[in-house]
Amino acid sequence: MDMEIDDPMHGSDEDQLSPTLDEDMNSDDGKNNTKARSNDEDTDEELEDFNFKPGSSGIADHKSSKPLKLTNTNINQLDQWIEHLSKCEPLSEDDVARLCKMAVDVLQFEENVKPINVPVTICGDVHGQFHDLLELFKIGGPCPDTNYLFMGDYVDRGYYSVETVSYLVAMKVRYPHRITILRGNHESRQITQVYGFYDECLRKYGSANVWKMFTDLFDYFPVTALVDNKIFCLHGGLSPMIETIDQVRDLNRIQEVPHEGPMCDLLWSDPDDRGGWGISPRGAGFTFGQDISEQFNHTNDLSLIARAHQLVMEGYSWSHQQNVVTIFSAPNYCYRCGNQAAIMEVDENHNRQFLQYDPSVRPGEPTVTRKTPDYFL
């Protein structure tokens, strides 16, 4: 075993902008084949500056005045891309450019707080573990039959970040009212330069062009979702600058993830056993106690905060007397942590069931020339 678990109460899935693992948690198996109806609609080290500015890829230059309307040609193209990607084969650079431009014309019209109908299946971090993502869809049911909400962190650490994010974006464009993809702290130019996605793009495409396309696209991902006005979903956690959900609606999200402030906090913060607000060991965001989550839920008439962002050994973990749940959907994280993964199904009556799963069978590991920083110090 080549890692130590350092301060599990402040563990993360991995990253810090000082890294740790979360505690082992209680589990609860559940099965629910509910189908969907349509919605109405890291470390303390200094990071390199590649001088890539938001928008440098040009994918947003053509932005439309109204959402993308799929034509038969679009649908056929997307179906071909999805079939190609399902074999874990990356798209060509030209096809990535086409896909990202289509995705901008979908995502730019989504709100900071994306409204979601039940039933829905809520998913946590995936982190480039593409074969486990396919297993997730087997466990939860195929899209568009099942309505999915992903809470961020599609890239970095796993070997197949390109295929993973391409697949999810293609599914989003193909089924825009069946799948929601939120932004995680790894959907960031700065973080992906260090933790794998940038290097993977260089290795697979020979340049940073695809990385630039996707990181420009990440700026358009919604930062939160609200399931039937009762379950507030986001990647990280709460912010001392946000008391109401309406304040989230007022944020300008079309930017690189800031180093501080409310948008940063929503993607970086973690629940904690200690009350009140605390300094996060990650170096970004805050820790927040049960008193904070209870007050936020009361103020906004919520039943639950659902979030991802932290490795939990059984795939999900309740916090703050079930005011908060953490969901982690990358089994055997980093191909060595030995954790289960989970997704949470919410039915029409707001009943919640957790589906847990183990790693899928995957081919041999690809050749990787650069070792990314180890989170498990």
From Swiss-Prot:
Modifications made to the protein after synthesis: Reversibly methyl esterified on Leu-377 by leucine carboxyl methyltransferase 1 (PPM1) and protein phosphatase methylesterase 1 (PPE1). Carboxyl methylation influences the affinity of the catalytic subunit for the different regulatory subunits, thereby modulating the PP2A holoenzyme's substrate specificity, enzyme activity and cellular localization.
Pfam families reported in the protein's UniProt record: Metallophos
Keyword vocabulary terms for this entry: Hydrolase, Manganese, Metal-binding, Methylation, Phosphoprotein, Protein phosphatase
Cofactor note: Binds 2 manganese ions per subunit.
GO molecular function terms attached to this record: metal ion binding; protein serine/threonine phosphatase activity
EC number of the protein: 3.1.3.16
Cited PANTHER family: SERINE/THREONINE-PROTEIN PHOSPHATASE PP2A-RELATED
Miscellaneous comment text of the record: Present with 4110 molecules/cell in log phase SD medium.
Function: Exact function not known, phosphatase 2A performs an essential cellular function.
Name of this protein: Serine/threonine-protein phosphatase PP2A-2 catalytic subunit
